[in-house]
């Protein structure tokens, strides 16, 4: 602008003065002010946008022959271009051809000079950019002595001048070098091709875009404020602080804060640093956003499983509104509505095909999949941490099994340990406070990553109020009363409620807590299945305690706690997952009912004898063809979490099973003699009508592709379903909209002046685009919205197309909701038929286990056990018995043994022998043969005759119990005391080296007393291993034939010295050969030095040990000889009593 009259004109240095003159197309651009160019023109040049200036600098220089080397024509053109830009801003629909035409007119008329009056519009158009850059301008051209003024003419003080100088210095530093403006204008956007040469070559004029506006501060960025989405997340997170939240954000799922750190560690994904806390802690005040991590949408199931398997509680927050419905709603400017839709933990994750079992099984760690609720109260009249009353409820959501129990436990907490080891929970829910002893037990069993459950167990706690028993009973009653309102079977419903209300108080307390807990996960409906409530303590099954499970290696070996090398591993020949689970239950619960056991053994025998027959082969082929875990899939249908492909697979598999035996109407028509097999096969065809009725409504091709829109068959006979009617309605609405879109093609063609209807195209997922060549762009109405384009054509949506697409999208969203609702209704309908379908699957599992036992029976050396009647005295008679696990793992096979235990004699075997001679293996093999016989399997023996044992108790191994602060000897006597309290005359007891944890005299005395008690008082069948020679001799006096001394046979030989003489100085050179055979008599030595030599103890140490051992033996023999001499003298004098005479005879035998 011109300065005031009478004053020197205000002059601003051009930015071009900062740049080095550059040669463009062979001509050097002048750096001084151009002749004939006004000051306003120079100011405009300085204040114009970077992109415009860059375009001017890069435009080719064309020399005008009339104007010489002057630049007036270019100045005129630049002025005119600025005006054209203003016009373009006012008319957004001007196309590239119009811009090119205006540029061409400017080139054809270069003469007019821009006068002062003509620059008014130019100055006005550049006022915005001038005001934006004005605060960076520092004018050094002000005359001395004249006060410097601002834009309004007011004088500036020193502070303002200093500030303007600093801003000027920053401006020069940032932009005062060649190509600075060019780089600034093109940053982040890529270089814009706006040169005149490219315009002429392409034939199209590129639109000149204004420079991108400076990016303002985002919400939640450096201002420290959270974005609306982050506030939304924080609101949900504060209600679920114990949950790792996975939030749906667009096409990804994201983690925020501490959840992102956890996800980065567990999932091995990148965690972008930021705030980890959710409480605005001062230590994170310098951070402006949450830490975050993200995963693709399609990987959600995989990563969710990994987090759950790692022991985390995982929640999925989903967007519960779609873009189409949001656009049509009132909250279009608000963030998507998000809600916590799913919550998972180890015990409540219902995976599709048992993937979590596959993950844990691969590492050898396998839990039972149970969620176990535990509570306890102090028993009346007992001290702190002594006896407690315990209640538990265990639920296996993947199969629908429910176990409950209420019992009293002692200070050793052996009963709780037994149930925990049997159930193997993957998650514990503890109600109230536990006693110190129970707390330590739970911590020990669940705390480590390689615990006896197989993997780390998640523990959650629930507070217990003062009036909890009454509240729990009321809560359970209301829960089941609500279920009974809609029930049509009154008798069944009444029986259901009566069964639940008669549960013990501790069990009711746990049941109430479990209902509340599972409601969060949407799994509370599992308690509707009261048919599958089972009491842990029942007289129809043998109770195997936790110590016995570990000692006999029933479920996993004792070395690395994997399944390989266990009894389950040796017997598992099942073909289905649900069959394998039933086999596991059978091994942990041997039968006590002789009639049921005889039926099972007879079924195994028939399948074994006809193993090559067509009927057995047909059954084997059917089971081998089942690839779906039907038990898990049925419970997922019951919960309403089954997918469409999975539902189709389940129904088709059940149909194939039912059709296979469609001709069977009665058990007698199966062709098998066994009642167990016949009844199981006869139950399979009964589900055919149920399955077929649902398959007739399903389109199999769409179900396999998980196509919700075509899942239901259009020609289905069932047309009364409201959900399917709604699907039809929405499909018709969509078809009507698409028909209108097709008819609109003619209207669009008429608008463009075409006779033929236009064709729609789809580009980058955008449908119903109308393509118009840029040469016909003038025919396009202003109301048409340009979506995209190329150099030769543009693509538009007409207002009618936009309206119809929005209407169609709304119908599509409604159709998707109708399809989901109809599918959920179908799942609910199938859930009403859960029990007959589950019974059919149970029959298949039974057949699978029986076939597995038949396959085991076909192994060499297996025979059918003979079960003696209950009236027969307790007896176990084995001929040629072998260890069922060791013979699979030992390359040289297992040496058979033969023995007999019976009442009245011999009730017990006192087993002696050298270390590593096979004593423990012998007693374990005998116990495993009994267990196998009572689960209905053939046994690895020439023959086995036995009565049913009500329990198997073991006290084996030597280890301390640090978690309970118990020494090795304390563990020994504690377990022994539990056996003495609970053993009955029909129990089998195994005691291995009792008393080794203390001194020789005390240990021998305790072992003697315990052996005397189990033989004289309890009178149970017992195998007693010992190294005490005195105990072997004393056992002979316990009664005529009550205790039989047996030992493990071996041979010994000595090595020659270097001189060729026998080594007489020590026992180091003595070689022991183990024969692993059971023989009568006592082994007088344990040959511990031989084991030490095998363990490679240094020879010098062995030589010293041998001398000490020989000296101690001589001292003991000397003392015994002196004692016997005194007794003999007393007897000779006639002073001795009958007891002394008996003692003398015993001493002589010991010598």
UniProtKB/Swiss-Prot annotation:
The keyword Signal does not apply. Residues 223-347 are annotated as: Mispair-binding domain. GO terms for cellular component: nucleus. Residues 84-110, 196-210 have a biased composition (Acidic residues). Residues 137-151 have a biased composition (Basic and acidic residues). It comes from the Eukaryota. Its main location: nucleus. Residues 71-80 have a biased composition (Basic residues). Residues 111-131 have a biased composition (Low complexity). Residues 1-156, 173-224 are annotated as: Disordered. ATP binds at residues 913-920. It is found in: Nucleus. SMART domains: MUTSac, MUTSd. One of its GO terms (molecular function) is ATP binding. It holds the Pfam family MutS_I. Component of the post-replicative DNA mismatch repair system (MMR). Heterodimerizes with MSH2 to form MutS beta, which binds to DNA mismatches thereby initiating DNA repair. MSH3 provides substrate-binding and substrate specificity to the complex. When bound, the MutS beta heterodimer bends the DNA helix and shields approximately 20 base pairs. Acts mainly to repair insertion-deletion loops (IDLs) from 2 to 13 nucleotides in size, but can also repair base-base and single insertion-deletion mismatches that occur during replication. NCBIfam families: PRK05399.1. Heterodimer consisting of MSH2-MSH3 (MutS beta). Forms a ternary complex with MutL alpha (MLH1-PMS1). Belongs to the DNA mismatch repair MutS family. MSH3 subfamily. This is DNA mismatch repair protein MSH3.
């Amino acid at each position: 602008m011109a300065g005031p009259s009478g004053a020197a004109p205000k002059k601003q240095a051009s930015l071009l003065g900062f740049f080095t003159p550059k040669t463009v197309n062979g001509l050097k651009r002048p750096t001084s002010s151009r002749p004939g160019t006004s000051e306003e023109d120079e100011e405009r040049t300085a204040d114009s946008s970077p992109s415009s200036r860059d375009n001017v600098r890069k435009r080719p220089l064309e020399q005008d022959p009339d104007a010489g080397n002057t630049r007036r024509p270019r100045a005129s053109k630049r002025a005119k271009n600025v005006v054209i830009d203003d016009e373009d801003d006012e008319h957004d629909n001007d196309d590239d051809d119009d811009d090119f035409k205006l540029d061409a007119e400017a080139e054809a008329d270069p003469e007019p000079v821009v006068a002062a009056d003509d620059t008014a519009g130019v100055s006005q158009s550049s006022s915005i950019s001038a005001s934006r850059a004005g605060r960076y301008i520092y004018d050094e051209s002000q005359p001395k002595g004249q006060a410097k003024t601002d834009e309004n003419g007011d004088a500036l003080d020193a502070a303002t001048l200093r500030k303007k100088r600093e801003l000027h210095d920053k401006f020069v530093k940032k932009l005062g070098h060649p190509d600075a403006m060019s780089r600034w204008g093109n940053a982040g956007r890529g270089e814009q091709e706006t040169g005149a040469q490219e315009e002429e070559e392409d034939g199209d004029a590129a639109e000149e875009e204004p420079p991108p506006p400076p990016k303002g501060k985002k919400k939640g960025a450096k201002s420290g404020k959270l974005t609306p989405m982050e506030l939304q997340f924080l609101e949900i997170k504060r209600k679920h602080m114990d949950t790792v939240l996975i939030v749906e954000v667009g096409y990804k799922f994201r983690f925020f804060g501490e959840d992102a750190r956890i996800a980065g560690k567990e999932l091995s994904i990148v965690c972008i640093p930021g705030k980890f806390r959710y409480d605005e802690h001062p230590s994170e005040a310098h951070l402006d956003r949450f830490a975050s991590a993200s995963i693709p949408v399609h990987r959600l199931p995989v990563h969710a499983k990994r987090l759950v398997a790692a022991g985390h509680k995982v929640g999925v927050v989903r967007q519960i509104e779609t873009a189409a419905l949001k656009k049509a709603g009132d909250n279009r400017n608000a963030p998507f509505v998000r809600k916590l839709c799913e919550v998972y933990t180890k015990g409540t994750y219902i995976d599709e095909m048992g993937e979590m079992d596959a993950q844990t099984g691969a590492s050898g760690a396998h839990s039972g999949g149970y969620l176990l609720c535990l509570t306890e109260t102090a028993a009346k009249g007992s001290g702190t941490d002594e006896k407690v009353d315990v209640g538990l409820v265990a639920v296996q959501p993947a199969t629908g099994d429910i176990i409950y129990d209420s019992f009293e436990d002692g200070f050793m907490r052996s009963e709780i340990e037994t149930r925990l080891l049997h159930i193997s929970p993957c998650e514990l829910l503890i109600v109230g406070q536990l006693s110190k002893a129970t707390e330590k037990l739970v911590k020990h069993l669940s705390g480590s990553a390689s615990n006896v459950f197989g993997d780390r167990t998640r523990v959650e706690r629930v507070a217990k109020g003062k009036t909890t028993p009454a509240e729990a009973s009321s809560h359970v009653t209301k829960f089941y009363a609500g279920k009974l309102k809609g029930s049509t079977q009154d008798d069944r419903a009444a029986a259901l409620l009566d069964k639940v209300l008669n549960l013990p108080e501790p069990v009711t307390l746990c049941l109430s807590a479990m209902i509340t807990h599972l409601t969060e996960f949407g799994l509370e409906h599992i308690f509707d299945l009261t048919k599958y409530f089972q009491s842990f303590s029942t007289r129809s099954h043998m109770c195997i305690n936790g110590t016995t499970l570990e000692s006999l290696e029933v479920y996993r070996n004792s070395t690395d706690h994997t399944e390989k090398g266990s009894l389950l591993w040796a017997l598992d020949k099942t073909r289905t997952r649900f069959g394998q689970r039933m086999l596991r239950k059978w091994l942990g619960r041997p039968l006590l009912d002789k009639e049921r056991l005889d039926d099972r053994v007879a079924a195994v025998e028939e399948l074994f004898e006809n193993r090559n027959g067509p009927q057995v082969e047909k059954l084997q082929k059917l089971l081998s063809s089942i690839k779906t875990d039907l038990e898990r899939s049925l419970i997922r249908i019951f919960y309403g979490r089954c997918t469409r492909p999975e539902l189709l697979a389940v129904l088709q598999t059940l149909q194939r099973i039912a059709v296979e035996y469609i001709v069977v109407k009665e058990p007698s028509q199966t062709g098998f003699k066994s009642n167990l097999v016949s009844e199981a096969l006869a139950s399979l065809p009964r589900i055919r009508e149920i399955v077929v009725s649902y398959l007739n409504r399903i389109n199999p091709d769409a179900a396999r592709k998980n196509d919700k829109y075509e899942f239901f068959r259009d020609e289905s006979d069932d047309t009364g379903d409201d959900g399917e009617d709604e699907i039809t309605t929405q499909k018709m609405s969509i078809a009507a909209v698409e028909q209108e879109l097709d008819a609109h093609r003619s209207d669009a063609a008429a608008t463009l002046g075409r006779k033929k209807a236009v064709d729609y195209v789809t580009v980058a997922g955008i449908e119903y685009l109308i393509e118009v060549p840029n040469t016909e762009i003038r025919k396009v109405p202003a109301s048409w919205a340009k979506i995209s384009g190329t150099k030769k054509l543009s693509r538009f949506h007409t207002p009618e197309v936009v309206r119809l697409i929005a209407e169609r999208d709304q119908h599509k969203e409604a159709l998707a909701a109708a399809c989901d609702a109809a599918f959920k209704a179908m799942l609910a309908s199938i859930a009403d038929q859960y029990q007959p379908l589950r019974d059919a699957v149970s029959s298949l599992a039974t057949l699978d286990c029986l076939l597995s036992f038949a396959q085991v029976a076909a192994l060499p050396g297996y025979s059918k056990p003979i079960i003696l009647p209950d009236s027969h005295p307790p007896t176990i008679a084995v001929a040629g018995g072998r260890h069922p696990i060791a013979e699979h793992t030992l390359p040289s096979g297992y040496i058979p043994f033969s023995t007999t235990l019976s009442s009245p004699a011999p009730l017990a075997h006192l087993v002696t022998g050298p270390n590593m001679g096979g004593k423990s293996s012998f007693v374990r093999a005998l116990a495993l043969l009994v267990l196998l016989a009572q689960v209905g399997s053939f046994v690895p023996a020439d023959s086995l005759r036995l009565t049913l044992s009500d329990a198997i108790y073991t006290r084996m191994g030597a280890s301390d119990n640090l978690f309970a602060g118990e020494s090795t000897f304390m563990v020994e006597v504690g377990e022994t005391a539990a056996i003495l309290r609970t053993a009955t005359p029909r129990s089998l007891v195994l005691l291995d080296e009792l008393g080794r944890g203390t001194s020789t005299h005390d240990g021998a005395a305790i072992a003697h007393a315990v052996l005397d008690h189990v033989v004289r008082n309890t009178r149970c069948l017992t195998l007693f291993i010992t190294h005490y020679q005195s105990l072997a001799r004393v056992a002979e006096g316990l009664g005529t034939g009550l205790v039989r001394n047996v030992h493990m046979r071996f041979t010994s030989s000595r090595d020659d010295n270097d001189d060729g003489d026998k080594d007489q100085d020590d026992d180091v050179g003595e070689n022991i050969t183990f024969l692993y055979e059971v023989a009568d008599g006592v082994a007088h030595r344990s040959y511990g030095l031989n084991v030490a030599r095998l363990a490679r103890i240094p020879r010098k140490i062995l030589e010293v040990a041998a001398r000490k051992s020989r000296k101690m033996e001589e001292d003991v023999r000397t003392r015994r000889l002196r004692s016997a001499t005194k007794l003999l003298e007393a007897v000779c004098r006639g002073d001795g009593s009958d007891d002394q005479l008996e003692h003398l005879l015993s001493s002589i035998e010991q010598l």
